[in-house]
Amino acid sequence: MRLFGNYLKVLVDSILYRDIVTRYQIRDDLALKETAYYAASNIGKKVSFTKLSQLLGLSNAITVKHYFSHLESVYLMFLIRRYDPSLKKQLANTKVMYGIDSALCRLIGFRPTDDEGRFLENIVFLELKRRQHEIFFHKGKKGCDFLLRNGTVITHAIQVSKQMSNPETRQRELAGLADALAHYPDAEGFILTEDEQATVNLNLSDERRVEIRIIPIWKWLLSR
């Protein structure tokens, strides 16, 4: 396992230096590496280019934006945008980070070993990307992990949660999904979990009632 971990770290360093530093003539290779490691440590979390540039001691947020663009170009890290009808607002808002491989993110990042929910979320993101969906996240009064858009229509709203047995967790996930579905009337609602399967009916208003499907992630992965 240690040899495999060392191999992955060498592989990442090789990609960073060969495919990014050399190709794009990056002067501060350490800042690029720290950006990649920061992203790996925070998969499924929001990032502000301005705040990260300050954390890394860089002069401006544009540099961090370029770093992430390079990381996406070599398929190491990915960003998704908060959905908004205004493209200008989409570009200005914070993004959410995901990685190309969960094992790689575990090894080069600094994540708590019990934070399995984020890695499940990363698995779902990668599958959505493999299926070539246009992916966003929702943030209104509550948040929803993924929105899928087809043309101009949001077709699916998806939450990812390792377990739904805790009442507070269940309420939070359902509330976030309900908030998303209230914004996008054409969307279907799903919650992907480790092992639960159920159907929940929610009243969004006096006129609208929606059905939410709770599905084990493994079953969803095999569904197409």
Region annotations inferred by a language model:
Residues 134, 188, 211-213:
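Conserved beta-strand segments of alpha/beta enzyme cores
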Residues 103, 107, 176-179, 217-220:
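Generic recognition of well-ordered alpha-helical segments
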